[in-house]
Amino acid sequence: SEMCIRDRNKKTVFESGAILIYLAELSGKFYNTKDRLEINQWLMAQMGYVGPMLGQHHQFHHYNPGKSKFGEDRYFKISRRIYRELDERLSNSKYLSGSNYTIADIGTFPWIARHEWHDIGLKSYKNLTRWYEEISEREGVKKGFAFMNESETPPKPCLLYTSPSPRDPK
C-alpha cells in the first residue's frame, strides 16, 4: 500500500518523501531554505537507497530467513555499507543535512530504528548511534512510537545482539 495524505483543502499528496516536503513547506519547519539542497540530497538518498535497501534486508533477514543465501549476503553487505556511510556523514555533521534536524533525518530515522532487524549492532557506529539516541529522545519521536503502539519506544542501541549474524565481523 502506498502512503497518501489528504489535507483540509482536499489536496492529496502521495509518497513519503513528497509528503515530508509538503508538510515541511506548510509548517515552515524542518526544511529551511538555506540548507534545502543538502536536505533534498539526503532525503532522496533515504528514498532511493537507505529505505529500499534496508527494506530488502528486512525481507531476506527478518521475514524470510534461510530462503536465499545470495539475498541475505547481498543485503547484509549493503546494510553494513549504509551504516558506514551514515556514520561517516555524521562524523562531520550533527544531522544528515547539517546542523539542524530536518525532514532528511525524519525520513531516515525509522529505518535505523529497526536496527535490531539488521544484525549489525548499531553501537559499532559511534556517530550514527549519537544521532539515533538524540533523535530517539525527541518528544515528537516518542509520541510517534506511542501512537503506533503504546508499549513500543525506540529500541536502544546495542553493540551485539543475543544472536548476532555470523556474517557480522566483530
Functional labels for PLM-detected ranges:
Residues 1, 6-77, 87:
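GST-like domain detector, emphasizing the conserved glutathione-binding G-site
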Residues 2-5, 161-170:
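Single conserved hydrophobic/aromatic residue that forms the stacking wall/gate
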Residues 6, 19, 86, 105, ...:
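Residue-level signal for nonpolar/aromatic packing positions in well-ordered secondary structure
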Residues 32, 74, 119-125:
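Structural helix-adjacent loops and short alpha-helical linkers that scaffold large soluble proteins
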Residues 32-38, 42, 93-104:
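All-alpha amphipathic helical-bundle segments outside canonical DNA-binding/catalytic cores
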Residues 54, 58, 96-121, 132-135:
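GST superfamily/GST-like fold recognition
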Residues 88-99, 139-144:
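Surface-exposed helix-capping loop/turn segments at secondary-structure junctions
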Residues 152-163:
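Acidic/histidine-enriched, glycine/proline-rich intrinsically disordered or flexible terminal extensions
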